[in-house]
Amino acid sequence: MGSNYIVIEGLEGAGKTTARNVVVETLEQLGIHDMIFTREPGGTQLAEKLRSLVLDIKSVGDETITDKAEVLMFYAARVQLVETVIKPALAKGTWVIGDRHDLSTQAYQGGGRGIDQTMLATLRDAVLGDFRPDLTLYLDVTPEVGLKRARARGELDRIEQESLDFFNRTRARYLELAASDASIRTIDATQPLEAVMNDIRTTVTAWIKEQGA
């Protein structure tokens, strides 16, 4: 089995950091140790600057970032990361574990912002071609639970301060996309932590066996 790209997705407060740790632990138990970690937006000097622009509520002063400008900044950061970090790592046989990828844009901008989904899909295909994660773990949590957890961590970024309706639309789009794509596995992240961790271990182990590892 060659290297693979595993992405962890979900609303704020879904538990992506914990999930990443469980994925790493599971891979190591299966004898896979060569891996790197990415986050989106971010992961390169350019992408980190774009991350600051798009998430920091003070980054552009009083100027409002338009929805389309937001989308384009996410894609600029994403393609830079994919072309300069992710693809080279995979080519060398290194596994990549990502905190968010394109599914976030399809859910947050397509669902939350209500941007035309055909336009987003066209933009994705133009920028990324047929590049996709091999496995995506979507951690499903209600906005009420997720935002409560996120607020407990401290100050919220620009997107985390959106309305509950925004996150309900985002979650609905996540679920819709997960139901239509076999490479996306949904984990019930409202369960007790140990149950969530067990589900992640079981899902990743079963998926790797499916790949013939």
Curated annotation (Swiss-Prot):
GO biological process: dTDP biosynthetic process; dTTP biosynthetic process; dUDP biosynthetic process
GO CC annotation, single: cytosol
Keyword terms of this UniProt record: ATP-binding, Kinase, Nucleotide biosynthesis, Nucleotide-binding, Transferase
PROSITE patterns referenced in this protein's UniProt entry, alphabetically: THYMIDYLATE_KINASE
Record keyword Mitochondrion present: no
EC class: transferase
Catalytic activity: dTMP + ATP = dTDP + ADP
Membrane spanning residue stretches: none
Binding site for ATP: G10, L11, E12, G13, A14, G15, K16, T17
Keyword Nucleotide-binding on entry: yes
Single GO MF descriptor: ATP binding
Pfam families: Thymidylate_kin (PF02223)
Gene3D superfamilies assigned to the protein according to its UniProt record, in alphabetical order: P-loop containing nucleotide triphosphate hydrolases
EC number in record: 2.7.4.9
HAMAP family named in the record: Thymidylate_kinase (MF_00165)
Function summary: Phosphorylation of dTMP to form dTDP in both de novo and salvage pathways of dTTP synthesis.
Family: Belongs to the thymidylate kinase family.
Protein name, as recorded: Thymidylate kinase
Lineage: Bacteria, Pseudomonadati, Pseudomonadota, Gammaproteobacteria, Enterobacterales
Gene encoding the protein: tmk
